[in-house]
Amino acid sequence: MLKFQETAKCVGRRPTVIPMYPTALIARRYVLQQKLGSGSFGTVYLVSDKKAKPGEELKVLKEISVGELNPNETVQANVEAQLLSRLHHPAIVRFHASFMEQETFCIITEYCEGRDLDYRIQEYKEAGKVFAENQIVEWFIQLLLGVDYMHERRILHRDLKSKNIFLKNNLLKIGDFGVSRLLMGSCELATTLTGTPHYMSPEALKHQGYDAKSDIWSLACILYEMCCLDHAFAGSSFLSVVLNIVEGKTPSLPDRYPRELNTIMERMLNKSPSLRPSAADILKAPYMEEQLQLLMCKYPEMTLEDKNSVCQKEAAHTINAVQKKLHLQTLQALSDTQKTTPRERMWLRKLQAADERARRLKKIAEENYKENDKRMQALRSRNVGSVHAHVLHELDERTLESLPEPQSLPCLDLDELEPSLEDTIVDLGHYEIPEDPLVAEQYYSDVFDSCSEDSEEQEEEMIFSEAGGDTKEEESPSVYRTNQQDSDTAALVGCLEHVLGYTSLDTKTITNAVTDMSPGPMVFNSAVARTKMKRMKESAVQKLGMETFEEVYDYLKRARHQNAREAEIWEHLETVVPRASDCFEVDQLLYFEELLLTMEGKEPSLQNLPCEAAQKKPVKGTHFCDNP
């Protein structure tokens, strides 16, 4: 029987060369080199940074179209940029900048020359080779460190898989935060219909929510894939994969791998989220602590400055960044500002300073008016009901004595006001503008600002704060963030030292003595579900064509309603399309349609969604095999 294989995304595969225009620049500094593929909701390119240091020119540009969004709609891609800008860890893809370019939102990240982990796994599989045990454990530790770093800062990845993990200098880096979101409030769950089925946890498939333990499940699937070069939960169709995950037996590693490593993986694949260990718990296990010590001996001796951990403060920074409503108009205004020359930026700052000065003067005048009016009201209330004139006269004298002497406001001289306006927001310096054009251009470059990534990020943060209505707090240094001269290896050593610092004091074994506190069904967001199903349908139509899609859709719907056998379904699909696996998205679309009807309390059109296992034994707790 034909086995289902996940649709390739091209990321990490052989790059596709796109037409080049050497004179065309993106954001006046990035030159397109190659198209690398497609991410969660954007196209990825390899670019060359003309303003980068020697040896650091190559970077990755993710381009997300926002042309269809209304001006008041929040740009979801900005969430990914905000998250990446707060994450500084050797096991996480480094963020450089983000900006608007016409009708697209662009994110610049570091370039990983080793492509993605899925490409490396397929490469070894085709060559008939397997990864060495020490290499797998080293990569597994790197992923644990990265996931623990994210979870400490209350960030979920939500789409961990081998295609979203990249290699740079043989170090693994977690990327593609396109569907990431924060754990908000006391209910630390986030419902989702996203994710690759091979890596999705049972609670996510049963729509019971997604939390940090769901990332742990996905990480265990990646560990199995590195060891066995195959998916932990396979199947010929979407539903068979789902049933295997929800009701199937927990897979085990081959005997050539340590029993302790297999035990850890099995605990990570526990059907109950509360019984799965966290990334920090796994790093504290005796076997992992031993591997951490061996890994420390492997790397050369390096020294890093000791810094205190500030996880709580960084989590607050990240929550504030994502809670801000950054709209399309704000991003476009930022893009226009970045394209201006230093001279134009100077005049913009002068205008902003003048507006700020005017607002301050207006506020002072209003406060003085209110204070004077209050005093007049007090005088009138004292004089009401006075019978004798001499009493009124005495009250007036006492009141005048108690009042402070009036202070006159000086007249504003425009000649004196102009220089004060310039100093209100930004200090432009006490230099005269040179008359020579070349010297003047250098003056503008030195005094005002430059077009470097640092200056652009500072201006971006200023606009973010204006749009969000709050000010940016001073960031504290992180234990994982190192100086620019420190390599990823040096930063990784710092992470290992940090982990070993507390594992030696707090070592414990992963146990099953945890009470099962599985969460119940969560609130269903039908609008989000319909949007994702619409995109899923568009992708299937683009792949199969409208006529073929309708034929496959109608057949699968009838076949599922009649409880047809999987073998019969796939045999018929092979007569309609060249590869039956191309119909996976149609099958997935039908599943989500029935799930949506069930969650909305409507009668599903498919009374019994078919699968051979479901005919023998209904799956408890799932919406696709039990009638509502």
UniProtKB/Swiss-Prot annotation:
Catalytic reaction equation(s): L-seryl-[protein] + ATP = O-phospho-L-seryl-[protein] + ADP + H(+); L-threonyl-[protein] + ATP = O-phospho-L-threonyl-[protein] + ADP + H(+)
Subcellular location: Nucleus; Nucleus, Nucleolus
Residue ranges, annotated region (Disordered): 452-475
Activity control: Autorepressed by intramolecular binding of the C-terminus which dissociates following phosphorylation by NEK2. Activated in response to DNA damage. Inhibited by zinc.
PROSITE patterns, per database record: PROTEIN_KINASE_DOM (PS50011), PROTEIN_KINASE_ST (PS00108)
Chief location category: nucleus
Modification after translation (UniProt): Phosphorylated by NEK2. Phosphorylation at Ser-274 is important for its activation.
Known partners and oligomeric status: Interacts with NEK2.
Protein name: Serine/threonine-protein kinase Nek11
Organism of this sequence: Mus musculus (Mouse)
Gene giving rise to this polypeptide: Nek11
